[in-house]
């Protein structure tokens, strides 16, 4: 439990410290502190607190200590869906972003990502202010966690379509080499990506390099450096401007 709490505190620190590399002041960064793999249970019972599975903790406020302002959920720290929606509405009305980037369940099957998408849409319901554009991204595909294929610095191919009835509108932003390097350095600052890969994964990667000619990322050992540092960003337009 102590290791899980430490990991959460490090993630909270990373969420306010690493954006400074891109010129985003910590006053504009907020950590909500809800617990991993519990959003689905929160959504199913909106009033029922869902404690951490690993940290022996049922209070989100431990991970909000670096926030520059209070949120509605700070009143009791209860990890409930109603608190999450209230927190999101307060943030949306405070920041009033023109563009919101969020996970898209059309491609990404992660339960927390699906629920995070639903939470943002629910928080937007009934607000007089609305963003101009919603953009979706995917960290994982339903059947292939190696997407996007290829090496660091390469392009990003479109993923396979899982549902022909659903229209996906891609949007691509080019990144100069200096921007790719800045992104790689930001990823390297994230504690989640710093531990060495397990032995089995290192052996598999060595075999892939030997037999398939796959190049390791020059930026780091974690697979995310290969997948995320590319010559362009690929997102999907969920709500056009």
Question: PLM ranges: what are they?
Answer:
Residues 2-14, 21-24, 35-241:
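Metal-dependent de-N-acetylase/amidase catalytic core
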